[in-house]
Amino acid sequence: MAALSLYFLVFSGPSPRLHIVPYTKGGNTVKQGSAKDTKNNQHDEKPLSSTRPEDVALKPDPGHHHEEPTGTRAGWEIDIDDLTYWSDPDDPETNDDVLPGYETDGTPREAGDVARLQHEKDLRKMWRYAYKTTAKLANSNLVYGNTLNQLIQKDNRTEEQSKCLREDPNVKFKFNDDQPVRFNPYPDYNGDEWKKNGHGPYVPCKGPTGEFVEDLLVFRGRPARWPQTKFGGYDLFGIDPNLCWERDSRLGQYGLQEMKKKVGGSYKPIDWDNVNWGELQKHCLKQNAARFDMTMSKKNPYLNNYTENHQKATRSEYIKTEAPKIKGRSIGAKQGQITKESRTALLLRSYTGMKYTDNDRQVIRALVSELSLKTGGQYEVFLLVHSKNQSLPIFDDDELYQTVLKDNVPAEFHGMTVLWSDHQVWDVYPALTDEYARAVHSAQWLSVQKFSQDHPQFDHIWNWEMDFRYTGHHYDLLEKLSAFAKKQPRKYLWERNERYYIPEYHGDYDTSFREDVAKKRGNKTVWGPPDLPFVKPVGPKPPVASHEEDNYEWGVGEEADFISVGPIFDPVDSQWIISNHVWGYSDENHKSTDLPRRTTIVTQSRISKRLLDIMHVENLRGQHVASEMTAQTVALLHGLKTVFAPHPVFMDRDWKGGFLNNWFNPGPDGESGGRGSPFGWGRERRFQGTTWYYRAEPPNRLYNNWMGWVDTNIGGIDWEKKHGRPCLPSVMLHPIKNTQPTKPGHKSEFELAIG
């Protein structure tokens, strides 16, 4: 089978000689060399190719793809004709339901119909083949089973990263010979640099033990078998890749281990139900009030952006408008003058009826401690809880509000919880009349917008999903993401945002990747907002008329209005299932579906008050797009800065960079959106083996094992006695479901409606 070996050569390292086990439709094994040919019934097996991996990964498409015209496909490295007699016994899809034609033949089709085209079915089969037949390779599944016993590169870090670590002779763990060190990623509060920059005095805050919050513990080194990143990288953010986090040292002080508090003359175990995290945060902020602008005006500066004349504003009128000044952003300060620091709210998105596991509670405690208490109030953590029962008038009855709160939120978090309901936000946005448009699935930002209008003291808000876990330090992560976004130039930024950054394929982020994007996009770039008669942009004016006059300078040092942790792609023609969910944004010359828009899968993101303010105004007008598109699209329309921060993403297969680029950035200019997008209906199985997506297998498996729970024959007490205590580098994991001890034989599964 000619191409059966070709795709294997997309793996890193030496070309493997493989024992390939194809399957027939009945699930029976076909011996190698006996696959049948349609003309001769059988043919001799062709020899493995001697082509180098790097050549194959980058070579043009060698395959045939059933009616898809030349020039509209990426190179897939697998020839579908060679898979005629291979089938996956776990694949319920048949060839009975096939529509004629191809995606680019001009026939209007819904996403579900595109998925029924033969070309799409072929792609799904090719990916299943690639993923299935590599499961047992020596360089597959290296993300699993890593422990403290395997650590290497323990002292390999920059001088700046070394400053964050300190020995603690009082710490002893019996499960490992090496002992962890303290990790402190915070500024040198009240030091010379702190004072030089004009900051107010920092006051340390106490936690639930009655003592100052202690720095986290972490082990130096990384597991020897742990793979390299496939998307993104640590070096982009300055995050230390050679640290390994173990569960007891990471979550012990948040309740995974018994914590004690001094009561009278003795220490007693903490009763977490008697802790009030809301009060702890408020008291901490009060102690540090001099550092922050506590009296920010509640006025939204854009409420009068659209008068009858403004709606007819031309682009020339727009570019004369200055962006509103944001207080407290000066780098230094005059002697005796305090530079006010910005504040960020973190909203944990929850709902009534959610059952909080012990792990959920430990992670929430970690967020409050690391982001709010340790920073003296720079961050504040809230539970934003959707009261789903629309018949309960909780805002008309204080007693009912408290009842709903007590019945649905652990006592320790009552003081940091904000309830909201559908009717509450619908009353704010009466122009949104379509029932589907204003439902929480399509309009999850409405509650965040209302929160921002009610709490204007926050310059930024993190929209935080409850099924997200970060094994590393939360403050280290958020500050590094923010700093990365701030230094990004606007030139070709939207175009960099719309693709996965694959280090092995793209090279250095700030040089070769940037140059590659510029070469592929040329003049097809976003430079300021689109010219639309029904949108009056509020963002800053480009400093020069054309991107060609800018040397990657505009935007450097500018805070991002939106930070995503996934590509910000163009959903048009992507076959993403809700790409056309647009309401309003039209006139007699523009259909709603003609609106330029962008989206990101998974809404974990940071958003500025400026962007939330104009989103609020657009929704007041009845202009709306689906949740995953909302912030990105409004930012595009208003000329605001958005950044995709390519955090490290790992995979359970050692795919070559060129292979990954073909499957995950298949657009004509190397983007992840548009035709062939991996986010399209029926294509998302490609994410099965990644550590970050809205459906993926490794996140739950890794987290279960890390917590000491059995999953897919790894983890648990007996396994750890033999192999050691699991540890993980700093890695973002999503989705994480059902964070509680598993039963023997448990296996996390990956399910899709199609694919």
Residue ranges and their predicted role:
Residues 390-457, 475, 482-505:
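Active-site-proximal specificity loops/subdomain of glycosyltransferases
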Residues 675-755:
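Terminal low-complexity segments of carbohydrate-biosynthetic enzymes
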Residues 5, 146-147, 151-346, 350, ...:
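Long, contiguous juxta-domain segments that are non-catalytic but functionally important
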Residues 457-467:
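Short beta-strand-to-loop acidic/aromatic patch adjacent to the donor-nucleotide binding site
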Residues 1-38, 43-56, 60-69, 78-81, ...:
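N-terminal signal-anchor transmembrane helix specifying type II single-pass membrane topology
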Residues 356-370, 398-402, 442-446, 477-478, ...:
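Well-ordered, non-membrane alpha-helical segments in soluble/globular domains
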Residues 8, 20-23, 473, 479-485, ...:
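Catalytic core and acceptor-binding pocket of nucleotide-sugar-dependent glycosyltransferases
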Residues 380-388:
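Short internal beta-strands
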